[in-house]
Amino acid sequence: MRIDAISIGKNVPQDVNVIIEVPVGGEPIKYEMDKEAGTLVVDRFLYTPMRYPGNYGFIPHTLSDDGDPCDVLIINTRAIIPGAVMSVRPVGVLFMEDEAGGDEKILAVPSSKLTQRYDKVKSYSDLPDITLQQIQHFFEHYKDLEKGKWVKILRWGGPEDAHKLILEGIEREKKKKG
């Protein structure tokens, strides 16, 4: 896969592309895209027997404070194969920190051209409380059994926070490339 050939999206930051790394409900394995090689690699096996509560991936051509592309959790129930590119609409952010520093997770829903199921979801707060609780529980505990690793949930943010993180991530990536 040539990640450099994949666009950020058609209407950034309201509609962005995400490269899927981990499918919803998949085995407790953390995959990451090797950005230089353009191939999916096994990052680690999760020590906790937990499954991702949404399809998980990243926005190409972005760079977060942690040195990786912006992370995205897509709220939907259909497993998307790792390596697929999906158009999404950001609706919020879960602000967290871990042993390495800040680690935000952008929440998104599939774009309307893929499904109209989420058209009324404009913000993370439009999602069912149980969905938000499951997402928070997953990220609070998915590293629990890994020595020296931890996660602290800071707060939820709305779509404007997600848009800001995406735009900052694009600028950070541009500066890195020079």
Curated annotation (Swiss-Prot):
GO biological process, one term: phosphate-containing compound metabolic process
Main subcellular location: cytoplasm
EC number, as in UniProt: 3.6.1.1
Subcellular location: Cytoplasm
Cofactor(s) required, per the database record: Mg(2+)
CDD domains reported for this sequence: pyrophosphatase (cd00412)
Molecular-function GO term, any one: magnesium ion binding
Disulfide-bond pairs as recorded: none
List of residues binding Mg(2+) 2: 71
Reactions this protein catalyses: diphosphate + H2O = 2 phosphate + H(+)
Domain of life: Bacteria
Binding site for Mg(2+) 1: 66, 71, 103
Binding site residues for substrate: 30, 44, 56, 142
A GO cellular-component term linked to this record: cytosol
Its biological purpose: Catalyzes the hydrolysis of inorganic pyrophosphate (PPi) forming two phosphate ions.
NCBIfam families reported in the protein's UniProt record: PRK01250.1 (NF002317)
Family, per entry: Belongs to the PPase family.
Subunit structure: Homohexamer.
Protein's UniProt name: Inorganic pyrophosphatase
Species of provenance: Bradyrhizobium diazoefficiens (strain JCM 10833 / BCRC 13528 / IAM 13628 / NBRC 14792 / USDA 110)
